[in-house]
Amino acid sequence: MNVKKHKFPGVYTVIEDDGSERIATKNLVPGQKVYGERIVKWKGEEYRIWNPNRSKLAAAILNDLKNFPIKPGTTVLYLGIASGTTASHVSDIIGWEGKIFGIEFSPRVLRELVPLVEERRNIVPILGDATKPEEYRALVTKVDVIFEDVAQPTQAKILIDNAKAYLKSGGYGMISIKSRSIDVTKEPEEVFREVEKELSEYFEVVERISLEPYEKDHALIVVRKP
């Protein structure tokens, strides 16, 4: 086995004995597993295998994402943090100098995040409605990146409204689009184009990448705030 730095800072490539490759993040809290992920040890460091079937961000990276603005020290507004599967890897990447403001609508789901944030002080869990960004104005600072994983028909508007309130000029948005959540009657490609058009009225659209085969009818769109 071997571990190498990935092209994105804070992400690593684990090369297995059979030559297969996985991506991983260096565990910020050694010994902590978050969602049953495999942990590997290499040269005194602990790495958590990042499962693309459980994380849309991992799927995008493995599908050769070109733009990944999350790096050590980044401040992230995470819309739809859920129980923290992907956020835990983002937490590893940004380190103690970075911060995640995690918005979750469901009190039950947010409770599942509590054991994680007790160890990971760079995650701030917030019970809130991502469609109403003014509700958490007292808790969230300006951020470098907004990551949105909210399966709603108004996904694009949610990102735009939160970016107006919290995203720094020159900052990036990353949005996971589930086409069937927006319009089940249209082909996914048509939905993705319509979302891109809506986003382009406020952002510069930087990249769109399919999440197949890990997620059916999903894409990740990366945008930049002028």
Curated annotation (Swiss-Prot):
HAMAP family named among the record's database cross-references: RNA_methyltransf_FlpA
One Pfam family this sequence matches: Fibrillarin
GO molecular function terms noted in the UniProt entry: histone H2AQ104 methyltransferase activity; RNA binding; rRNA methyltransferase activity
Gene3D superfamilies linked: Phosphorylase Kinase, domain 1, Vaccinia Virus protein VP39
Protein name: Fibrillarin-like rRNA/tRNA 2'-O-methyltransferase
EC number: 2.1.1.-
Subunit composition and interactions: Interacts with nop5. Component of box C/D small ribonucleoprotein (sRNP) particles that contain rpl7ae, FlpA and nop5, plus a guide RNA.
GO biological process, one term: tRNA processing
Keyword rRNA processing: yes
PROSITE patterns: FIBRILLARIN
Role noted for this protein: Involved in pre-rRNA and tRNA processing. Utilizes the methyl donor S-adenosyl-L-methionine to catalyze the site-specific 2'-hydroxyl methylation of ribose moieties in rRNA and tRNA. Site specificity is provided by a guide RNA that base pairs with the substrate. Methylation occurs at a characteristic distance from the sequence involved in base pairing with the guide RNA.
Source organism (scientific name): Thermococcus sibiricus (strain DSM 12597 / MM 739)
Assigned protein family: Belongs to the methyltransferase superfamily. Fibrillarin family.
Highest taxon above the source species: Archaea
Keywords (A to Z) from UniProt: Methyltransferase, RNA-binding, rRNA processing, Transferase, tRNA processing
Residues the entry annotates as binding S-adenosyl-L-methionine: T85, T86, E104, F105, D129, A130, D149, V150, A151, Q152
